From Swiss-Prot:
It catalyses: sn-glycerol 3-phosphate + NAD(+) = dihydroxyacetone phosphate + NADH + H(+). It is linked to Hypertriglyceridemia, transient infantile: An autosomal recessive disorder characterized by onset of moderate to severe transient hypertriglyceridemia in infancy that normalizes with age. The hypertriglyceridemia is associated with hepatomegaly, moderately elevated transaminases, persistent fatty liver, and the development of hepatic fibrosis. Belongs to the NAD-dependent glycerol-3-phosphate dehydrogenase family. Expressed in liver (at protein level). GO terms for biological process: cellular response to cAMP; cellular response to tumor necrosis factor; gluconeogenesis; glycerol-3-phosphate catabolic process; glycerol-3-phosphate metabolic process; glycerol-3-phosphate shuttle; positive regulation of glycolytic process. The modification Phosphotyrosine is found at Y326. This is Glycerol-3-phosphate dehydrogenase [NAD(+)], cytoplasmic. The gene is GPD1. Keywords: Cytoplasm, Disease variant, NAD, Oxidoreductase, Phosphoprotein. The lineage of its organism: Eukaryota, Metazoa, Chordata, Craniata, Vertebrata.
Length: 349
């Protein structure tokens, strides 16, 4: 069997952390081609191109400083050139950019290429919810899997122990992806409920914004625990309404579910920015620049998409926590009123 060529589409904080793992494994395992391409959105860093810095210093100095990437990971500034020979495409870009990237890649991929999405977010289609893996799969005509879990990028790059979940309908492909990405400190469970795994990854960012509001307002640990639990209930309810495939509670007990929700509500960037938003009154855009090096936050954007989908279906009242995050972020509702969505939650009626 010919060795599989791998391309990582994206090179932010999480993309670079995954490149470190995938590059290391591809160099050692016969089933993969050792040369791993990584598409890098070209930027100028102190008069040098970011791709040149990565290919000479083997470090993404902007998005994952202090971590060496394996020398077999090659940064390529042209997405078509990076992806055209790949058998496996790993998608890891902010979800608002995926449509444009798919438009560029369409018609340029190998006939038997497959993809895996590490992107946390949802898209609103004309008929309501669209998962990012569906968007990619439909636009590029390739089978898609997903990887979601309690994986804060800097900790993964530091090789601190964590778990993650791959959702893949084809068991053989799931096993291949596990071989490509598993390490002693990055442990993977493969499940077949792709939709549920992916929806967990998108929705938890909205809950984390709520958790950040709690922290910024000084509400304490009991309130934050309630936000996490009520958020989980809304996640499960939303999945049961909108996933086309089966939705079992067991999937929410995997790393993609409750574990990712907890880590994001205590350690992730959505929580951090939401806390600063509640404390300072600065805009989300301003805080993205100050705290995230200009990287985009997924939680508020996902809340906006959820609002659009739920309003279309007449179900806004069933998801008060999701809707409160939307209203605070986009409609100018005072952040201090966030507590009302908890006090009047349908879970308690």
């Amino acid at each position: 069997m010919a060795s599989k060529k791998v391309c990582i589409v994206g090179s932010g904080n999480w993309g670079s952390a995954i490149a470190k793992i995938v590059g290391g494994n591809a160099a050692q395992l016969a089933q993969f081609d050792p040369r791993v391409t990584m598409w890098v959105f070209e930027e100028d860093i102190g008069g040098k191109k970011l791709t040149e810095i990565i290919n000479t210093q083997h470090e993404n100095v902007k998005y994952l400083p202090g971590h060496k990437l394996p020398p077999n990971v090659v940064a390529v500034p042209d997405v078509v050139q990076a992806a055209e020979d790949a058998d496996i495409l790993i998608f890891v870009v902010p979800h608002q950019f995926i449509g444009k990237i798919c438009d560029q890649l369409k018609g340029h991929l190998k006939a038997n290429a497959t993809g895996i999405s590490l992107i946390k977010g949802v898209d609103e289609g004309p008929n309501g919810l669209k998962l990012i893996s569906e968007v990619i799969g439909e636009r590029l005509g390739i089978p898609m899997s997903v990887l979601m879990g309690a994986n804060i990028a800097s900790e993964v790059a530091d090789e601190k122990f964590c778990e993650t979940t791959i959702g893949c309908k084809d068991p053989a492909q799931g096993q291949l992806l596990k071989e490509l990405m598993q390490t002693p400190n990055f442990r993977i469970t493969v499940v077949q409920e792709v939709d549920t795994v992916e929806i967990c990854g998108a929705l938890k960012n909205v809950v984390a914004v709520g958790a950040g509001f709690c922290d910024g307002l000084g509400f304490g640990d009991n309130t934050k625990a309630a936000v996490i639990r009520l958020g989980l209930m809304e996640m499960i309810a939303f999945a049961k309404l909108f996933c086309s495939g089966p939705v079992s509670s067991a999937t929410f007990l995997e790393s993609c579910g409750v574990a990712d929700l907890i880590t994001t509500c205590y350690g992730g960037r959505n929580r951090k920015v939401a806390e600063a938003f509640a404390r300072t009154g600065k805009s989300i855009e301003q805080l993205e620049k100050e705290l995230l090096n200009g990287q985009k936050l997924q939680g508020p954007e996902t809340a906006r998409e959820l609002y659009s989908i739920l309003q279309h279906k007449g179900l806004v009242d069933k998801f008060p926590l999701f809707m409160a995050v939307y209203k605070v972020c986009y409609e100018g509702q005072p952040v201090g009123e966030f507590i009302h969505c908890l006090q009047n939650h349908p879970e308690h009626m």
